[in-house]
């Protein structure tokens, strides 16, 4: 029996489509016919009707139709389903035969052509004798036909042609060969599809009619057969709902059949076919849960129907195929849009298929283990006359025999032997690997990493059994990384054991050594005797000898491997193998730890290397090297012990390089750092531990950084979480888990022995030359040289501060923008022990706020470390935060000559500018001078002189000045008129005389200037006296270019009598002035209101008395009447 018998037939797996044959087309030599055929077949879209087309000659012989039975009373079926039945109805027996014929309605030789067409149709009918296949005629015409009813000749000839061909009008079609050929073809397809539907409907009714003659005693097989046929025809008819329903019925009928060893394979085969159809249709109907439920039911019903014990491997092969087929269906549905999840995806079915394939392999190994002398039977009992079986699932040596009794036991025995011998030639590993590969791809797609790893291990083992060791190692290496990272040590040990076998059988030296190192380590769960064997083999390899074979290896493979090992030993080449241990868990652990996170350059750098062995026996290493990021230190950190190759495993505990299992070995290293590395990090880049020697083979274990391997991080985490009390160890031993890797340290400068003091008077004032006195004193025991000072604004602050801060050593010069914010490397000479020096630093801060200033002093000094003299560069820095504040606040305001606040001033009218300077400094300030610089638009009424020269202001004190100004008429200026600048020259009172004076410029505010039509001012004494005449003169000045008509009136006051014009109307010419004279006579003492002068301008009605009162006084102080003093009074006084 062929090993491919378990594959489902192609006709079962494909989508059934109506089969239509096309005759009369010469697709090779006729271009028109070729275009018609291409339109039917090429680039068919999914929305076109499901039809399978085939071009056949008109006289093609179709399968003969067997005579119909009138009775099934004496008929005993020989099987359930014939092997050729599905293919026959898919590809051999058409539902419709279409005869293509070139004939136009206006054909001159119509009669002859009609007769020829009828003959062709008759030939087709003869070849379909007994079939219900439909026949149709398509006339290929050159002209586009007229609409129905308009072409009378066409109607008549069409009817005549139908009569001649014995066709109905629905079976005659016209195909014009025009530019719209595809459109006509699609319409033809739809018509063909209707004819095919009719044919399959007829076939379903025909099969159903047979069921009436069946009985369940002798025709059980026919019930299954007919139900399957009805379902299959329904699929061809594209009635998938009815197809599914009938397949379900057929499936139930299969399991109602009486099962025996002789027919169990046929029952399972048909059950598998029908189950496949049911599941496929469920997925097609988008009911995946129904498909899964059906498949589970199918497996539950069939998994115990094993059949012959001698052929039980066939049952596993069948089970494997069931799972694989369902996995394929599931995957196909997903590609068409179905959504799967982690817990329900095709990978589980491929995995189960692989499991049964493995079971098949094991059973075949047991049942097919015949001796080499056993020959394959002749004649071959598995051969048939036609080369294929008549019925699915039957044995070739007893086809059609339904008896449960074996009529010829000898033939049965020979047949079983033939199957077993054929099974022995099956490459099971290839089948298993393919299934596992499919499963891995699915689990990877659905993000199931552990399932993927588990199956990859199985794939690796299958490759090992298939003797493809290279692929096996590739897969196992991939999985080992996952198992190490997750701590699955038992699984890792199993995988490593297989990998070690592969590397041995391939004689791969480096891989063999690597896997041996890990199997000896703490991650391995092997017993001590197994580890001892591996350790011995490892030492043999290092001594350039062949290792002993690994247990349970194939004998022939071992012999081949021994030859390979012998060749490896004889070949000359590199005998040093460097193995990076970061990605696996070797039997030696290493940790590096510096004694401190930083070392001063004048102190030796010290660190320890801790080593611990986990192998069964003490082992001696030959060399230890530590590498740094600065390779000049490598030479100081090497330990080497010469030993012979055969001493590696000797039970010696002497020597630094001999490691005892479970004991921690500590190795101390120290060296003097270079002065150039001050401020740099020294890192241990790698630790190399050599096993063996160069005369044999040498393995160098390389730890990156300060040690640690693939399991270290997980072990450190577990140790940190553990509350278990550690046992007390002797003083010279340490707990391995308590050692923390510290692979880097910092080289820092020697501790300076100087003092740096800063003397200043904060806060700093804006723009002043602020003095900072730096005092440096040496406390070293020897002279220090090349002392340098760096001082100024500390780097890394706001860029705006850098631009507005300037530093200098010369306080007599005022800093400008060219001065830096930081002075670097100012040489200040040498200092003897106890000697000190001072430097004065001047800082100018242009903006307020906090600033951090740095004073950095560096120097050189000679010192001795480990009997080696070095030059150390020491430094000390001090930082100070200085707040910068404004020295004073300046307030400016405009008032009238009456000291009333002004929102605006009036052209040519004097007003007062008042400045108020308030000290905000905590230190006394000296105002050296002040100056008012007027804008061109302003003029002064009197001489401008500073009123605050050399005034000293304490905190909170203020100094004020007053200036009388006026502004000429400038017209209406938007935004007001510029006043000018107020310049203040000042310095800190405590500052030295040579410190420059600071000038602060205050920009005065703009003022709004307005023109008035009439200006009035009054001349009157500063006070009056009761009952004494008080002369008052009013000056009225016309400020316009027009003649002003002025009405003047005086309102009396209770405190005064007056003489003069009480009411008058007068005219004032442009630019001229008019005077009004009055004598006021005070009646009461005190601060009295003057008689009110009211003015009305006829041309300027908006000129109000309220505006007028801004310019003239409204009240005056009146003293009481004085007494005449006589001489006596004077004398008494």
Swiss-Prot record:
Location relative to the cell: Golgi apparatus; Golgi apparatus, cis-Golgi network
An individual GO BP term: Golgi organization
GO cellular component term, pick one: TRAPPIII protein complex
PTM annotation (N6-acetyllysine): residues: 245
Primary residence: Golgi
UniProt entry tagged with the keyword Transport: yes
Keyword Plastid listed: no
Keywords carried by this UniProt record: Acetylation, Disease variant, ER-Golgi transport, Golgi apparatus, Limb-girdle muscular dystrophy, Transport
Disease (UniProt): Muscular dystrophy, limb-girdle, autosomal recessive 18: A form of limb-girdle muscular dystrophy characterized by proximal muscle weakness with childhood onset, resulting in gait abnormalities and scapular winging. Serum creatine kinase is increased. A subset of patients may show a hyperkinetic movement disorder with chorea, ataxia, or dystonia and global developmental delay.
Protein family according to the UniProt entry: Belongs to the TRAPPC11 family.
Function noted in UniProt: Involved in endoplasmic reticulum to Golgi apparatus trafficking at a very early stage.
Quaternary state and interactors: Component of the multisubunit TRAPP (transport protein particle) complex, which includes at least TRAPPC2, TRAPPC2L, TRAPPC3, TRAPPC3L, TRAPPC4, TRAPPC5, TRAPPC8, TRAPPC9, TRAPPC10, TRAPPC11 and TRAPPC12.
Protein name per the record: Trafficking protein particle complex subunit 11
Organism lineage string: Eukaryota, Metazoa, Chordata, Craniata, Vertebrata
Gene designation per UniProt: TRAPPC11
């Amino acid at each position: 029996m062929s090993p491919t018998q378990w594959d489902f037939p192609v006709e079962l797996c494909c989508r059934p489509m109506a089969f239509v044959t096309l005759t009369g087309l010469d697709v090779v030599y006729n271009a028109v016919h070729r275009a018609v055929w291409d339109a039917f077949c090429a680039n068919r879209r999914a929305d076109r009707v499901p039809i399978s087309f085939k071009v056949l000659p008109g006289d093609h012989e179709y399968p003969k139709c067997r005579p119909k039975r009138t009775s099934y009373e004496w008929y005993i079926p020989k099987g359930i389903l014939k092997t050729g039945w599905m293919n026959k109805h898919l590809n051999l027996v058409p539902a419709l035969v279409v005869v293509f014929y070139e004939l136009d309605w206006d054909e001159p030789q119509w009669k002859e052509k009609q007769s020829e067409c009828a003959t062709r149709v008759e030939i087709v009918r003869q070849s379909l004798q007994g079939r219900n296949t439909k026949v149709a005629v398509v006339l290929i015409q050159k002209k586009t036909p007229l609409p129905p009813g308009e072409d009378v000749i066409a109607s008549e000839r069409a009817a005549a042609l139908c009569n001649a061909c014995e066709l109905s009008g629905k079976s005659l079609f016209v195909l014009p060969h025009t530019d719209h050929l595809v459109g006509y073809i699609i319409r033809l397809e739809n018509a063909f599809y209707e004819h095919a539907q009719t044919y399959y409907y007829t076939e379903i009714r025909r099969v159903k009619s047979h069921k009436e003659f069946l009985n369940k005693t002798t025709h059980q097989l026919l019930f299954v057969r007919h139900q399957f046929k009805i379902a299959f025809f329904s699929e061809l008819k594209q009635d998938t709902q009815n197809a599914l329903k009938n397949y379900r019925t057929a499936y139930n009928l299969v399991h109602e059949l009486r099962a025996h060893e002789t027919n169990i394979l046929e029952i399972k085969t048909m059950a598998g076919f029908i189950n496949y159809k049911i599941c496929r249709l469920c997925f097609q109907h988008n009911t995946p849960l129904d498909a899964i439920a059906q498949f589970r039911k199918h497996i539950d019903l069939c998994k115990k129907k094993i059949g012959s014990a001698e052929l039980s491997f066939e049952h596993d092969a069948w089970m494997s195929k069931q799972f694989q087929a369902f996995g394929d269906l599931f995957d196909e549905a997903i590609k068409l849009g179905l959504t799967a999840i982690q817990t329900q995806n095709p990978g589980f079915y491929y995995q189960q298929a692989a499991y049964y394939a493995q079971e098949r392999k094991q059973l075949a190994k047991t049942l097919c283990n015949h001796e080499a002398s056993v020959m394959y039977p002749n004649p071959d009992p598995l051969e048939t006359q036609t080369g294929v079986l008549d019925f699915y699932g039957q044995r070739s040596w007893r086809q059609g025999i339904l008896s449960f009794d074996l009529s010829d036991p000898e033939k049965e025995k020979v047949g079983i032997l033939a199957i077993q011998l054929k099974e022995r030639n099956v490459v099971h590993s290839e089948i298993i690997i393919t299934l596992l590969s499919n499963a891995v791809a699915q689990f990877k797609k659905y993000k199931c990493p552990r399932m993927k790893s588990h199956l990859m291990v199985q794939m690796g083992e299958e490759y090992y059994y298939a003797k493809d060791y290279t692929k096996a190692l590739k897969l196992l290496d991939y999985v080992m990384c996952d198992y190490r990272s997750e701590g699955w040590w038992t699984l890792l040990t199993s995988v490593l054991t297989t990998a070690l076998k592969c590397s041995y059988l391939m004689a791969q030296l480096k891989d063999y050594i690597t896997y041996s190192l890990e199997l000896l380590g703490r991650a391995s769960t092997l017993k001590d005797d197994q580890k001892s064997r591996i350790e011995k083999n490892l030492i043999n390899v290092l001594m350039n000898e062949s290792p002993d074979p690994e247990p349970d290896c194939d004998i022939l493979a071992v012999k081949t491997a021994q030859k390979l090992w012998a060749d490896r030993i004889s070949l000359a080449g590199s005998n040093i193998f460097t193995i990076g241990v970061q990605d696996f868990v070797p039997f030696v652990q290493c940790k590096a730890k510096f004694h401190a996170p930083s070392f001063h350059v004048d102190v030796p750098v010290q660190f320890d290397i801790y080593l611990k062995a986990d192998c069964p026996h003490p082992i001696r290493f030959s060399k230890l090297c530590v590498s740094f990021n600065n390779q000049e230190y490598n030479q100081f950190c090497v330990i080497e012990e010469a030993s012979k190759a055969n001493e590696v495993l000797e039970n010696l505990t002497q020597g630094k390089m001999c490691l005892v299992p479970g004991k921690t070995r500590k190795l101390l290293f120290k060296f003097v750092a270079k002065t150039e590395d001050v401020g740099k990090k020294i890192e241990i880049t790698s630790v190399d531990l050599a096993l063996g020697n160069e005369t044999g083979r040498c393995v160098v274990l390389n730890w990156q950084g300060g040690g640690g391997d693939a399991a270290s991080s997980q072990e450190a985490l577990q140790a940190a979480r553990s509350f278990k009390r550690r046992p007390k160890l002797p003083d010279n031993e340490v707990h391995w888990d308590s050692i923390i890797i510290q692979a880097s340290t910092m080289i820092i400068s020697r501790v300076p022995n100087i003092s740096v003091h800063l003397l200043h008077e904060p806060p700093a004032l804006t723009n002043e030359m602020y003095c900072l006195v730096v005092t440096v004193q040496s406390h070293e025991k020897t002279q220090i040289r090349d002392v340098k000072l760096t001082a100024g604004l500390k780097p890394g602050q706001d860029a705006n501060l850098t631009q507005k801060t300037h530093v200098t050593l010369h306080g007599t010069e005022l800093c400008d923008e060219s001065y830096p914010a930081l002075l670097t490397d100012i040489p200040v000479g040498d200092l003897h022990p106890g000697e000190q020096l001072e430097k004065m630093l001047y800082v100018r801060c242009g903006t307020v706020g906090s600033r951090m200033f740095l004073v950095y002093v560096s120097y050189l000094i000679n010192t001795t470390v480990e009997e080696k003299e070095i030059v150390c560069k020491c430094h000390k820095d001090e930082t100070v935060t200085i707040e910068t504040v404004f020295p004073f606040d300046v307030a400016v305001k405009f008032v009238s000559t009456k000291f009333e606040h002004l929102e605006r001033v009036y052209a040519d009218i004097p007003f007062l500018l008042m400045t108020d300077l308030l000290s905000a400094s905590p230190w006394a300030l000296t105002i050296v001078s002040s100056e008012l610089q007027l804008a061109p638009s302003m003029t002064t009424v009197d001489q401008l002189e500073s009123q605050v020269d050399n005034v000293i202001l304490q905190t909170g004190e203020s100094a004020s000045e007053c200036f009388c100004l006026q502004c000429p008429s400038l017209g209406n200026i938007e935004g007001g008129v510029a006043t000018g600048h107020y310049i203040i020259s000042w310095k800190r009172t405590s500052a030295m005389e040579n410190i420059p004076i600071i000038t602060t410029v205050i920009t005065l505010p703009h003022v709004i200037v307005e023109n008035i039509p009439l200006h009035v001012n009054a001349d009157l004494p500063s006070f009056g006296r009761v009952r004494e005449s008080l002369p008052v003169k009013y000056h009225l000045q016309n400020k316009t270019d027009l003649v002003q008509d002025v009405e003047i009136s005086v309102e009396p006051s209770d405190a005064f009598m007056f003489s003069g014009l009480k009411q008058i109307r007068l005219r004032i010419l442009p630019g001229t002035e008019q005077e009004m004279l009055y004598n006021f006579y005070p009646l009461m003492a005190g601060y009295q209101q003057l008689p009110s002068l009211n003015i009305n301008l006829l041309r300027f009605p908006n000129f109000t008395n309220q505006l007028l009162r801004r310019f003239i006084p409204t009240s005056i102080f009146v003293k009481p009447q004085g007494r005449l003093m006589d001489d006596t009074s004077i004398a008494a006084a």
